[in-house]
Amino acid sequence: MGKKAGVPVPLMPLEHPLLFFGPLPEAQGAEDFLVYPLLRDQGNSAYVRDTGRLHGGMLEWGYYEDKNPRLVDPEDIGNPEKTMGSDSMRYLDLEEVAEPLEKAFETTPILNELGWDEKSSFNGLLSVTPDAGSLIGESPEVRGFWLCEAVWVKDGPGCARLCAESMVNGKTQVDMHSFDIARFYPEQKEKEFVKSRAFENSQTIYTPAVHPREPYISSREKYVSPFYEREKELGGFFDNEVACWERALAYKSNEQKLDKYLKDIPVREN
């Protein structure tokens, strides 16, 4: 739809394996909506959750591939050879998740006891952006074209509210910078840039934990200043970039000045 309207949408679909086990005997006829709480298995990049009595009382095991995430070309969404019932439900290859699934059986043996429901299991699709944030707001390219994309379950209600507030009031109650679709420059909407950054972000959805300012490795040196080579000679630390421009945060050539100024730098105990 974005392509037809002339609106670039900087995101990549990502396959998300969803395996179902059960049903849970405890859920049959139970008054409680849920029997078990959600378990997040950080070390295995996976989670286990109770789907609820109204959804068959199954246990859902979801996995985030942290080594070779399987991005899906937008043109391939809806490929009848790869989908089952819905464009966002793709066939699951059990071999792709065999190793983490074995670990899950050790951590949560109830999965093995209940048994795998093959017919209900599939690869879902998630949306991942170049900076792992959602895309909310009016398109900079086409007036009146609004987006609320790359929104995951836990963020759905809040993102919907922000989008509605933007439409009705022209502003929101919170700072929209990290969600606003307009935060991306044209170069950051190019397909290869989006794909490489989305792949990198997909590797760290659950594990390993990364610092919010962790520098990106992919799609670097797109733009450099005329004095970039000189900055490198001075030992520039190009740990980050701004709008695709390389920017040095510090210079090794200034290291000798620590003796003079270190005493003026406050000590942070925490």
Where are the model-predicted features located?
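Short, glycine-/Ser/Thr-/acidic-enriched flexible segments
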Residues: E26, R53, D66, E141, ...
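A short alpha-helix-loop-beta-strand transition element characteristic
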Residues: P8-M12, G170-M176, F237-D239
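Short, well-ordered strand-loop elements centered on a beta-strand within folded domains, enriched
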Residues: H55-Y63, G144-L147, D259-K263
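Flavin-dependent oxidoreductases
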Residues: M1-Y91, E102, T107-L114, E192-N201, ...
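Glycine/proline-enriched, intrinsically flexible loops and inter-domain linkers
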Residues: P186, K191, K195-N270
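Generic structural signal for residues positioned in beta-strands
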Residues: L18-F20, Y47, E60, L135, ...
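C-terminal catalytic lobe of FAD-dependent flavoproteins
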Residues: G43, L71-P74, T83-P208
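Short, basic and Ser/Thr-rich N-terminal targeting/leader segments
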Residues: D41-N44, P130, E241-W245
